């Protein structure tokens, strides 16, 4: 039996043990993981340095190297995240609803772990810690499959987690790493229906699209973020500029940053030049349609491809429209159903936007940067779902649970 199948089989076995563990036992294990990460920081950083050196030799970009890099402070941040996770309410065992039937049957809908979670992701070794600890908190076993670029870091982190779990009542194989980083191992994970209950991809559009297209295992899709902000005719000028600057420039490489601004032509004629100047002062490259170019000749003419691109950089597309209907059509045509916003003082238009735009998170007079588990008050988050089944938006702890019905009677039979 090869590595992927063997670890899948073992994960299924361990899941039956893990479901019996109490919240106290799971929290003890999380505390042990946090302590062990601090205790073995030097070892983790040494292995991470190998990934960085290999990445430099392969010509990785500075942004990719930054995503790969671990530092003492980043490991401290990971452990602080685990401590916050310990404080969160455990959803497992929660009664979602209960009722009694006329025949005396008492019915409860209870939260239970999903079972075995597969996680396939790129570059960031911090995802190894996030996924492992969130799954432990929710009573799920997890099979991690990171990228070859972070293999030394991921192996070190999982080894540290195993040493921590050995000190607790939780099986160390609650967390397993697929060390084979070839495409064959990924493809095998896609079709492990006998062992995996769900597969969660985290990474770029190409990875996510590949998993969605090829996996027969149920997938929780954490989609790309081609996010828009529509500035309506009635939008407050300074509010609009401040929100656009924040949503684009605070952290341009994240999925909840905007990639296109859609401007009502009347607002653009009055305030567009000031908005464009503010963006260009911050190093933003603007790519617009012909109506945008008529307002500012320094804007580069956008291609059809630009409207559907998640730039993840200081590049921003600009679309000028004559109505809210045109804005909604553009957003629904090119958006990725992640986060979309309207800046407006017209409540009728806001209501129309909220009803008509298809996305996981919709904003009125606020930045799309708030689409995040911690900002929503969920605490930990394993990703942001852009699909409609099971869960949508930031996936907090309840997203890693399912439900079962528990029915209590006193001898009832169906007539």
Swiss-Prot record:
TM stretches of this protein: none
Pathway membership, UniProt: Amino-acid biosynthesis; L-proline biosynthesis; L-glutamate 5-semialdehyde from L-glutamate: step 2/2
Catalytic activity line of the entry: L-glutamate 5-semialdehyde + phosphate + NADP(+) = L-glutamyl 5-phosphate + NADPH + H(+)
Taxonomic superkingdom: Bacteria
Residue pairs linked by disulfide bridges in the UniProt entry: none
UniProt keyword terms in alphabetical order: Amino-acid biosynthesis, Cytoplasm, NADP, Oxidoreductase, Proline biosynthesis
The keyword Cytoplasm belongs to this UniProt entry's keyword annotation: yes
E.C. number(s) listed in UniProt: 1.2.1.41
PROSITE patterns (alphabetical): PROA
One BP annotation, GO: L-proline biosynthetic process
Signal sequence interval, chain numbering: none
InterPro entries per the UniProt record, alphabetical: Ald_DH/histidinol_DH, Ald_DH_C, Ald_DH_N, Aldehyde_DH_dom, G-glutamylP_reductase_CS, Glu-5-SA_DH, GPR_dom
Membership in a protein family: Belongs to the gamma-glutamyl phosphate reductase family.
Main function: Catalyzes the NADPH-dependent reduction of L-glutamate 5-phosphate into L-glutamate 5-semialdehyde and phosphate. The product spontaneously undergoes cyclization to form 1-pyrroline-5-carboxylate.
Protein name (database record): Gamma-glutamyl phosphate reductase
Originating species: Bacillus cereus (strain ATCC 10987 / NRS 248)
Recorded name of the encoding gene: proA
């Amino acid at each position: 039996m090869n590595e992927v199948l063997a670890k899948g089989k073992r994960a299924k076995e361990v899941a039956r043990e893990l479901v019996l563990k109490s919240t106290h036992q799971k929290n003890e294990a999380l505390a042990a993981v946090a302590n062990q990460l601090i205790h073995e920081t030097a070892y983790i950083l040494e292995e991470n340095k190998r990934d960085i050196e290999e990445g430099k030799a392969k010509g990785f970009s500075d942004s990719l190297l930054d995503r790969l890099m671990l530092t003492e402070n980043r490991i401290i941040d990971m452990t602080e995240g685990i401590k916050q996770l310990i404080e969160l309410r455990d959803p497992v065992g929660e009664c979602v609803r209960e009722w009694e039937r006329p025949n005396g049957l008492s019915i409860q809908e209870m939260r239970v772990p999903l079972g075995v979670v597969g996680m396939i992701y790129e570059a960031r070794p911090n995802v190894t810690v996030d996924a492992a600890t969130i799954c432990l908190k929710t009573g799920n076993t997890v099979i991690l499959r990171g990228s070859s670029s972070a293999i030394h870091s991921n192996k070190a982190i999982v080894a540290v987690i195993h040493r921590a779990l050995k000190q607790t009542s939780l099986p160390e194989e609650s967390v397993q790493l697929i060390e084979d980083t070839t495409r064959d191992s990924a493809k095998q994970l896609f079709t492990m229906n006998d062992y995996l209950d769900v597969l969660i991809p985290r990474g770029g559009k190409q990875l996510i699209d590949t998993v969605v297209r090829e996996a027969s295992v149920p997938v929780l899709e954490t989609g790309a973020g081609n996010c828009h902000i529509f500035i309506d005719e009635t939008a407050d000028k300074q509010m609009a500029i401040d929100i656009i600057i924040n949503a684009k420039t605070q952290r341009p490489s994240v999925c909840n940053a905007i990639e296109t601004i859609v401007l009502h032509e009347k607002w653009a004629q009055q305030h567009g030049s000031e908005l464009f100047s503010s963006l260009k002062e911050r190093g933003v490259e603007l790519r617009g349609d012909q109506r945008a170019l008529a307002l500012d000749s320094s804007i580069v003419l956008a291609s059809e491809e630009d409207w559907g691109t998640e730039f993840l950089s200081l590049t921003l597309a600009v679309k000028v429209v004559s109505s809210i209907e045109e804005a909604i059509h553009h957003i629904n045509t090119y958006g990725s159903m992640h986060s979309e916003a309207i800046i407006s003082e017209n409540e009728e238009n806001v209501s129309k936007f909220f009803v008509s735009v298809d996305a996981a998170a919709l904003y009125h007079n606020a930045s799309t940067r708030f689409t995040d588990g911690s900002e929503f008050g969920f605490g930990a988050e394993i990703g942001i779902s852009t699909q409609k089944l099971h869960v949508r938006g930031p996936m907090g702890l309840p997203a890693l649970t399912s439900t079962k019905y528990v029915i209590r009677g006193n001898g009832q039979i169906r007539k």
